[in-house]
């Protein structure tokens, strides 16, 4: 199992993405010391929902937070296709920053365009790409499999199922995901779950993933 911590990025919804830079720097240092493999700090250069720096995250903010970290670690950014910049030049190229992973998500109706954009972004930046299926508990088993079979044809290192509403119970509902997980793995994708704790199930679901090698 490989942990990606996105507390500052996803937690930004509770404070309008306005983390104090000193706090963010201390947080990143702590993640470094406990050897979290990947840390995601914000949405990259988006401004439709907030003008604050962890929604409109950029190179300058990254430098302020990352410089001085005692142990280098891999960095990830998130983009929502519906809101993100479509200018490829707005994104860093591999090796120019600590960022080496872009995670993209999209609405159902935007999926074909999002996949095409992710493919272009991968080719132009040489960054690893990941796709996150949001609201995954809203899908039927067949809908989820159909979606993942489409995603599996593209060059994503990781594919995540997001428990956007925190109502996922993998002990009871994993059968809804089983075929999709197998299809992704068959196509060489690494599979993950993005867990939320709205209903107090995140730890339970974490142990399910850990015990089932997800």
Regions found by a protein language model. Give the residues of each.
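N-terminal small/glycine-rich loop or linker at the start of catalytic domains
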Residues: 1-16, 72, 123-135, 183-190
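Charged helix-capping and loop-helix junction motifs
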Residues: 20-21, 55-60, 143-149, 173-179, ...
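Alpha-helical scaffold segments that flank or form the walls of functional sites
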Residues: 23-37
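Alpha-helical structural signal in soluble globular domains
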Residues: 64, 68, 120-124, 150-154, ...
């Amino acid at each position: 199992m490989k942990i990606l911590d996105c507390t500052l990025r996803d937690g930004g919804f509770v404070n309008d993405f306005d983390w104090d830079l000193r706090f963010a720097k201390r947080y990143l240092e702590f993640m470094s010391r406990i050897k979290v493999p990947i840390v995601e700090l914000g949405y990259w250069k988006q401004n439709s929902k907030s003008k604050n720096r962890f929604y409109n995250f950029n190179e300058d903010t990254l430098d302020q937070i990352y410089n001085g970290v005692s142990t280098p670690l891999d960095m990830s950014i998130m983009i929502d296709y519906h809101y993100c910049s479509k200018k490829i030049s707005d994104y860093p190229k591999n090796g120019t920053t600590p960022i080496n992973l872009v995670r993209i998500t999209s609405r159902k109706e935007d999926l074909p365009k999002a996949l095409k954009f992710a493919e272009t972004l991968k080719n132009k930046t040489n960054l690893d790409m990941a796709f996150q299926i949001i609201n995954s508990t809203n899908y039927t088993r067949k809908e989820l499999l159909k979606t993942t079979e489409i995603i599996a044809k593209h060059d994503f290192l990781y594919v995540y199922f997001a428990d956007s509403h925190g109502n996922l119970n993998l002990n009871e509902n994993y059968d809804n995901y089983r075929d999709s997980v197998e299809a992704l793995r068959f196509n060489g994708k690494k599979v993950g779950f993005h867990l939320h704790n709205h209903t107090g199930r995140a730890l339970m679901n974490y142990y399910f993933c850990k015990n089932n090698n997800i």
